[in-house]
Amino acid sequence: VPLKRRDSFRFQQSFLSYLAINPLQNFAATLSLRQPSYNEDRARALYPILSNWMEWSETEQMQFRRTIGPRSTAVESRPNIVILQCESFSMYKSSMSGNPLNTTPFVDSLSRKGIFFERCFAPTFSTARALFAILTGVPDAQLFKFSSRNPKALNQYTLINSLEGYEKHYFLGGDAEFNNFEGVLQNVEGLQMHTGQRPSIPPINVWGISDKDLLHEAHTLFNRAKGPFFAYIQTAGNHRPFQR
């Protein structure tokens, strides 16, 4: 029986998993992370632009803290919060970007009727970069690959931890070890992981169970909730390859 990609992720160490996938390629790629560089002069030169974009009041000293007070009493009602990350949903192709083709009218309607975070973005492609940006509120600017695979970038703050008294759930149809999603998710305290193989739900491709089954699973759990909950549902059905 030929080995499948997920067979490489049975190890406890992510390095061994990536080594098993493609030893030579991953060995060469990992060399780029031996000495991560930080160019302070370049950072200081670009700081005024970043400071203006982030609306920082103090611009003389180079600091990256931004404090925003509560703007409504919505959280005081302790609502259930569900974030649904749609795989390969390109912003520039959507109606929200002003695309004249009006490709996503229903999602555009949701963005206008709800809260649209227009400054939450990842600087380039990759599901891992999007996950990092959404959880931390910081764009993944890792030059090589992405921050989820850089041990020095994994320890991040997330606003989700300030939801006191909430159950916290993460749903993925496949394995969260892929691209070390799990490393980023470990920043969420008390997070319950619903990933990997399900005994009663067959996988449909290399990414695991279907998005429909994933959403049904989440809905079933939500109906049993005894208190407020936060959930992050990450779809994968729009990601190649689509076959097993």
What residue ranges belong to the model's regions?
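N-terminal secretory/membrane-targeting segments
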Residues: 1-79, 96, 111-114, 119
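Solvent-exposed soluble domains appended to multi-pass membrane proteins
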Residues: 54-244
